[in-house]
């Protein structure tokens, strides 16, 4: 037993290795064997000797005092008492000393046979069920068949007890006396003992070789897969051998380590009871069973009893290691499963997440916050009592320094008495000592900021109103925590990096986040809003001209000039070119007051200030005037805002809300329209679904008309000085939606529905016609309650989802740090303005701003250089690129960055929170995760303000010309037909057709639109059209299938009750045939049109379609055969948004994926097999692909259509993995970025692309091996792409030995260099022996993969980071088998081991830097030079 006196862990280790513990290493770390199950003596409360709390093994219970009390005091330090054998030392050693239990029989470790992949099972090639039979002593297993091999008994055969005894009887006597190594001896065992023997006899290299051979050459796919699974485990052990000794037989336990007693305490409660850790119970069971087994073996008990006891011991050890894995877990009272060692690590309450990643912090306090409007940007108010407590040690030190007290104890008394001298000292201590304020939940880095404290009376912390947005704080009872940075570095970082006045921009999008809100905005809006004189309300001083701002202020103060008067004043204006010019300005008197605080280099701001305008102005001030002036500017506008809101006395009255006069006429009109839709329906002209959709559309339209009227009316009221209108228009409070409900009508509400996703809200078709001013009647109120409650319930549920998303994002991106200036890649992303139809969603300037260009970009016409390659695109450059008419620019992106670890500064571009290029060491991954996760919580909290009203999106059902020009058709198959009224119409039959509008002169395509199947054309090819003219229209509510020619209808497999059901409308009595899903897969409903002249043509019909024709009916070309109702008019709620974001980040396949074409080609329909329709696509070069499409899906292509690769054949969403395999990595990356952005855009949340790019980059780090070649990879293994490249480069130009000839060094299958081959062959040649035959080594082949963020986090290089994320036991057991080394490169693993994170000021580059003054350095250099010169002189003399 090793005795380590001072095992202090040195804290500058650079890597952590995990491996299996050998019995020897457990013994070495142990301080003694625990032999008794007793814990403590119930009378003396002293630990029992040899028990689980024994002092001899684990150390004394009291400092410097042995068990029997013979030695007390520190002077006997290190002595081992001769009476009780306890070492006299500190009691804290009971936290670190381990013990052990020596087991009589080995047991298997539950992690390695219960969790998948089953390590022991794969090593031996045994299935889990059979393995259990061995481990739990049900069967014998043959380890060596020996002489019995001729009787057909083979290695790894299973024997029942009878068979085993039978064989033993027939064996020759002397066989059992042979040595185990003798190949003739018959050996069969059971239990973990057998496994240990089997594992120790394995030859890993041979096993690996034979498995690789099987995986490469086996014909059966299943055996191939099996071999690969086994190879994974075998290779893991072989891989570990290169670093550390790691034997397979160590998965079997002979020694059980006993963790230190202080980590599993036993605490006496009052009333003579004890509270104990569950581990003590589990250990006790192991010891009791082990001792009983020992005794049974000594008294030579029968085999049956021994076997039972051995099995119980195995189960006891299983429960100790992992109790949650077992089916019959050991339970305490109240049927609660005991917490085993594994459970101590797992989950939110486990060691990793509870104690290593989130610790409680000393020097902290928390209190309620109140607003502090007179504070400066960098200040906060700290209650005196809190400050005195937080800074106690500092005060005590000063008290002793000043000689006021002599001892710490008396100083403490003074501080606790709160003597007046304490406040004096405290003022001094606080100078230049910032504190950190934090509001939970901390969703992004602005949730913790530093402030300079000001002492205040009272008990609440005062917070600056402008930082509330960043903290997401309000003053309705929020609490905040205060922390004190102690070290010099900490104080420096707090006051330079975290101080509130430096965090003006939001890292998510680079827009200012410290923007005035509520009262401040209202005040600023009010003061900068002008009004004209009217006879009843003359405005003082209207039309006056002033020489300067001071005159205006005097006039206002004297009461000669109203703040709202329109006046002329001389001021300095900033031109577009950025020069400041003096000129006369037409403005409003109040705006002059505002401009007094605007920094002069910005020029005169002549705007009506709303919240959005203020954000832009603050952004502009930040760019032009810099950070410190912006902070002062913010404080000033806060002052004006509050001041003016108070002066204006703005408040709401009931009369401020007017109800539009023509509300009732509009509603009556709508009711009439709805009635006519109903009568159409009752006559059977439209389906129920169409009726529903039309009714919803009517109400949506009327609602917005009423809202528009209401807004116009409010705006006209008192020249726009209606308080409610001002609040809404300025952005201070309230939205258009809310005002609509106050004065218009509440509108359509969502129907209660039982779907959790909330992706589609069906709408109740009777809207609420009243508004809140008129009051709702009972039924309207009742309908409203559902929406309101749903909003609140959603909020509660979604917050958790968003939080979990953030956690996964942080975990996947935590090691993305800027590690180098330039990775030197030549690749980039081509970006252009994002358009939705023709509305620009995001202009090119915004997408390229702050990025680095890949190439030189020249002006199209003048050919001047706009930006050179590798240069950051600033605001000016972006504007000039936009003005030059360049459509797209190739920019550097983290998606194409070639850095081995993290990414490089050039590919990342600008750091959004400072507006400068990003610095090395910035942890961009965490910033990205926070930027995406933080609005996620916002999105979820968006639903309940509007009170559950349904926002509806009306659908387009036509294409209008956006420009004047000439129409050109592309691939457009059309057919002439007549509609229901008998008029001639042109119907589109193809699905890939496009209408283009071409400029008549240059022939340039101005716009190209896809035309849906079944649309009616209003124009002809080559026709000239005007802007706004309708080109075509279609039925927005139904997708249709049309007949292509004249003929007679014949139904195929359309049988009532089997493939369709008659739905009769209760109201109309009309009966409709609706196709349903049938169990009988041979029945495939189709409509066949029998052509008068040619071939008949069949149309297969998807489930849910409505038939529009009868059997035997005559049809014309272009007539509708089938209507498939489109689900339109569904409300989009961000509830649908959050699961969508999750789905994209997890790279999950959507529930009904589309079948996608992999090649360009012509479509042909095949036969129908097993309920699937075959579709063939043949490309021009003769490649033919076959797709099986379920008949229940709607097929989007017709026979003989031309389809492009990556286009869907059926309806449904395209899966990301399809995009990856067909269009490649770049396409899938862009798809993910755009789709995720789309969800956030709908909510009006701006997130910069680069954040999402970083996460997507992390999802695409791995490649999948298709062919392993001669590398060490396995087929289907996921490998880091850089590792893959390295391994392939490594094997390049190497040779593989095919035949070794007469060489003694080389074996077949060895990989050697050309040099080794040359040397070996030349030496063989000299001896006239057979030469070595070789072939070139084959590199591995891989394909890019897309991993979900959870999978990517678990596959990270660092096992510590992965284990602290999810599936802790699985990650750790895998890592132990592999003997993994964690080099502590990411942030998370460093936090866990207690190091500084390798980012920012904690970069490892700074570790060895010595900080000194310039003078010292110069003097050192000078003296070194002088010394060298003197030395030189001496040498010359000698």
Curated annotation (Swiss-Prot):
The gene is rpoC. GO terms for molecular function: DNA binding; DNA-directed RNA polymerase activity; magnesium ion binding; zinc ion binding. Belongs to the RNA polymerase beta' chain family. It is an enzyme of class 2 (transferase). GO terms for cellular component: DNA-directed RNA polymerase complex. CDD domains: RNAP_beta'_C, RNAP_beta'_N. SMART domains: RPOLA_N (SM00663). PANTHER family: DNA-DIRECTED RNA POLYMERASE, DNA-DIRECTED RNA POLYMERASE SUBUNIT BETA. DNA-dependent RNA polymerase catalyzes the transcription of DNA into RNA using the four ribonucleoside triphosphates as substrates. Zn(2+) 1 binds at residues 66, 68, 81, 84. This is DNA-directed RNA polymerase subunit beta'. InterPro entries: DNA-dir_RpoC_beta_prime, DNA-dir_RpoC_beta_prime_bact, RNA_pol_asu, RNA_pol_N, RNA_pol_Rpb1_1, RNA_pol_Rpb1_3, RNA_pol_Rpb1_3_sf, RNA_pol_Rpb1_4. Zn(2+) 2 binds at residues 823, 897, 904, 907. Keywords: DNA-directed RNA polymerase, Magnesium, Metal-binding, Nucleotidyltransferase, Transcription, Transferase, Zinc. Its EC number is 2.7.7.6.
């Amino acid at each position: 037993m090793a005795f380590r006196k001072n095992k202090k862990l040195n804290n500058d280790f650079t890597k952590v290795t995990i491996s299996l513990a050998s019995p020897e290493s457990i013994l070495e770390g142990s301080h003694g064997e625990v032999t008794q199950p007793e814990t403590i003596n119930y009378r003396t409360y002293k630990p029992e000797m040899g028990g689980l709390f024994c002092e001899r093994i684990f150390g004394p219970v009291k400092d410097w005092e042995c068990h029997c009390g013979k030695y007390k005091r520190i002077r006997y330090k290190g002595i081992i008492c001769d009476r009780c054998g306890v070492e006299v030392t500190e009691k804290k050693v009971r936290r670190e000393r381990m013990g052990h239990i020596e087991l009589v029989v080995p047991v298997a470790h539950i992690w390695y046979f219960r969790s998948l992949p089953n390590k022991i099972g794969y090593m031996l090639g045994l299935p889990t069920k059979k393995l259990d039979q061995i481990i739990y002593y049900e069967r014998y297993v043959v380890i060596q068949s020996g002489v019995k091999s001729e009787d057909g008994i083979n290695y790894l055969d299973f024997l029942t007890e009878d068979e085993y005894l039978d064989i033993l009887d027939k064996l020759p006597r002397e066989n059992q006396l042979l040595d185990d190594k003798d190949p003739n001896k018959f050996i069969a065992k059971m239990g973990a003992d057998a496994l240990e023997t089997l594992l120790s006899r394995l030859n890993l290299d041979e096993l690996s070789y034979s498995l690789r051979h099987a995986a490469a050459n086996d014909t059966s796919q299943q055996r191939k897969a099996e071999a690969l699974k086994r190879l994974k485990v075998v290779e893991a052990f072989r891989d570990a051998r290169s670093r550390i000794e790691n034997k397979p037989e160590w998965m079997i336990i002979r020694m059980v380590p006993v963790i230190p007693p202080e980590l599993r305490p036993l605490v006496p409660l009052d009333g003579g009871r004890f509270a104990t850790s569950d581990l003590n119970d589990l250990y006790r069971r192991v010891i009791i069973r082990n001792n009983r087994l020992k005794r049974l073996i000594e008294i030579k008990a029968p085999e049956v009893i021994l076997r039972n006891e051995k099995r119980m011991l195995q189960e006891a050890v299983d429960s100790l290691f992992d109790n949650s894995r077992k089916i019959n877990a050991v339970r305490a009272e109240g049927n609660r499963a005991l917490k085993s060692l594994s459970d101590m690590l797992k989950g939110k309450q486990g060691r990793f997440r509870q104690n290593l990643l989130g610790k409680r912090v000393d020097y902290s306090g928390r209190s309620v916050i109140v607003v502090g409007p007179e504070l400066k940007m960098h200040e906060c108010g700290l209650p005196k009592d809190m400050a005195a407590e937080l800074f106690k040690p500092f005060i005590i030190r000063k008290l002793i320094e000043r000689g006021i007290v002599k001892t710490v104890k008396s100083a403490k008394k003074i501080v606790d008495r709160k003597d007046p001298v304490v406040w004096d000292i405290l003022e001094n201590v606080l100078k230049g000592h910032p504190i950190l304020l934090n509001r939970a939940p901390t969703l992004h880095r602005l949730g913790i900021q530093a402030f300079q404290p000001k002492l205040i009376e009272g008990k609440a912390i005062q917070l600056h109103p402008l930082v509330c947005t960043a903290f997401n704080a309000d003053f309705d009872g929020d609490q905040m925590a205060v922390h004190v940075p102690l070290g010099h570095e900490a104080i420096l970082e707090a006051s330079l990096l975290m101080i509130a006045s430096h965090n003006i921009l939001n890292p998510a999008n680079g827009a200012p986040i410290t923007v005035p809100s509520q009262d401040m905005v209202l005040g600023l809006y009010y003061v900068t809003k002008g009004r004209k004189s009217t006879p009843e309300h003359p405005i003082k001083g209207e039309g006056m001209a002033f020489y300067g701002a001071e005159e205006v202020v005097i006039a206002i103060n004297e009461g000669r000039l109203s703040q709202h008067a329109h006046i002329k004043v001389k001021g300095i204006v900033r031109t577009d070119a950025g020069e400041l010019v003096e000129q006369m300005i037409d403005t409003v008197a109040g705006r002059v007051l505002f401009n007094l605080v605007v920094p002069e280099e910005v020029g005169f701001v002549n705007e009506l200030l709303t919240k959005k305008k203020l954000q832009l102005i603050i952004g502009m001030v930040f760019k032009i005037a810099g950070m410190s002036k912006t902070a002062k500017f913010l404080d000033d506008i806060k002052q004006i805002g509050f001041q003016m809101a108070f002066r204006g006395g703005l408040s709401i009255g009931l009369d401020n809300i007017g109800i539009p006069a023509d509300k009732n006429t509009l509603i009556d009109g709508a009711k009439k329209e709805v009635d006519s839709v109903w009568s159409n329906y009752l006559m059977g002209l439209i389906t129920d679904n169409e009726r529903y959709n039309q009714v919803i559309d009517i109400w949506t339209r009327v609602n917005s008309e009423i809202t528009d009227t209401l807004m116009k009316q409010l705006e006209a009221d008192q020249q726009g000085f209606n308080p409610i209108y001002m609040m809404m228009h300025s952005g201070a409070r309230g939205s258009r939606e809310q005002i609509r409900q106050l004065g218009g009508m509440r509108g359509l509400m969502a129907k209660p529905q039982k779907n959790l996703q909330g992706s589609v809200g069906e709408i109740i078709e009777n809207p609420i016609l009243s508004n809140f001013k008129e009051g709702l009647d009972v039924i309207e109120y009742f309908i409203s309650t559902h929406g309101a409650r749903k909003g609140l319930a959603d909020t509660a549920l979604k917050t958790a989802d968003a939080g979990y998303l953030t956690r996964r994002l942080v975990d996947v991106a935590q090691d993305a740090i800027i590690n180098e200036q330039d990775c030197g890649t030549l690749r980039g992303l081509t970006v252009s303005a994002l358009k939705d139809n023709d509305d620009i969603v995001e202009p090119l300037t915004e997408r390229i701003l702050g990025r680095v260009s890949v190439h030189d970009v020249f002006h199209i016409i003048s050919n001047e250089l706009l930006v050179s390659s590798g240069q950051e695109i600033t605001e000016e450059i972006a504007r000039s690129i936009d003005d030059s008419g360049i459509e797209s620019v190739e920019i550097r992106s983290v998606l194409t960055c070639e850095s081995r670890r993290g990414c490089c500064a050039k590919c990342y571009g600008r750091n959004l929170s400072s507006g400068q290029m990003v610095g090395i060491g910035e942890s961009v991954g965490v910033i990205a995760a926070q930027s995406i996760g933080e609005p996620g919580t916002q999105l979820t909290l968006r639903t309940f303000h509007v009170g559950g009203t349904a926002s509806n999106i009306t659908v387009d059902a036509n294409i209008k010309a956006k420009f004047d020009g000439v129409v050109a058709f592309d691939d457009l198959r059309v057919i002439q037909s007549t509609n229901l009224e008998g008029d001639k119409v042109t119907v589109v039959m193809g699905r890939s057709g496009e209408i283009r509008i071409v400029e008549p002169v240059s022939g340039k395509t101005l716009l190209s639109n896809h035309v849906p199947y079944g649309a009616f054309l209003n124009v002809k090819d080559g026709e000239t059209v005007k802007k706004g003219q309708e080109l075509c229209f279609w039925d927005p509510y139904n997708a249709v299938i049309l007949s292509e020619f004249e003929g007679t209808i014949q139904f195929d497999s359309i049988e009532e009750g089997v493939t369709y059901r008659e739905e009769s409308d209760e109201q109309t009595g009309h009966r409709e045939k609706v196709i349903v899903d049938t169990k009988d897969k041979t029945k495939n409903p189709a409509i066949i049109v029998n052509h008068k002249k040619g071939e008949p043509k069949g149309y297969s019909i998807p489930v849910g379609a409505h038939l529009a024709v009868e059997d035997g009916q005559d049809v014309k070309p272009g007539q509708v055969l089938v209507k498939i109702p489109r689900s339109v008019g569904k409300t989009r709620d961000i509830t649908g948004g959050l699961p969508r974001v999750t789905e994209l980040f997890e790279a999950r396949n959507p529930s009904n994926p589309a079948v996608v074409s992999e090649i360009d080609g012509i479509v042909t329909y095949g036969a129908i097999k097993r309920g699937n329709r075959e579709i063939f696509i043949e490309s021009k070069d003769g490649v033919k692909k076959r797709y099986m499409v379920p008949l229940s899906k709607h097929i989007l292509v017709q026979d003989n259509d031309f389809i492009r690769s990556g286009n869907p054949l059926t309806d449904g969403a395209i899966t990301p993995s399809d995009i990856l395999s067909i269009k490649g990595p770049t396409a899938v990356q862009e798809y993910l970025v755009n789709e995720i952005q789309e969800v956030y855009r709908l909510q009006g949340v701006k997130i910069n692309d680069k954040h999402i790019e970083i996460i997507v980059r992390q999802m695409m780090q791995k490649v999948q091996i298709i062919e392993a070649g001669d590398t060490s990879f396995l087929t289907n293994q996921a490998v880091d792409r850089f590792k893959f490249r390295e391994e392939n480069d490594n094997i390049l130009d190497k040779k593989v030995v095919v035949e070794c000839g007469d060489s003694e060094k080389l074996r077949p299958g060895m990989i050697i260099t050309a040099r080794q081959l040359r040397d070996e062959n030349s030496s063989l040649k000299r001896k006239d022996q057979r030469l070595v035959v070789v072939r070139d080594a084959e590199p591995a082949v891989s394909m890019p993969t897309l991993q979900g963020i959870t999978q990517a986090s678990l596959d990270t290089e660092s096992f510590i980071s992965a284990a602290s994320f999810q599936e802790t036991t699985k990650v750790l057991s895998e890592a132990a088998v592999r003997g993994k080394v964690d080099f502590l490169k990411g942030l998370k693993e460093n936090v866990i081991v207690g190091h500084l994170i390798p980012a920012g000021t904690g970069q490892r580059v700074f570790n060895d830097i010595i900080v000194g003054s310039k003078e010292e350095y110069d003097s050192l250099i000078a003296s070194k030079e002088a010394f060298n010169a003197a030395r030189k002189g001496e040498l010359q003399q000698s």
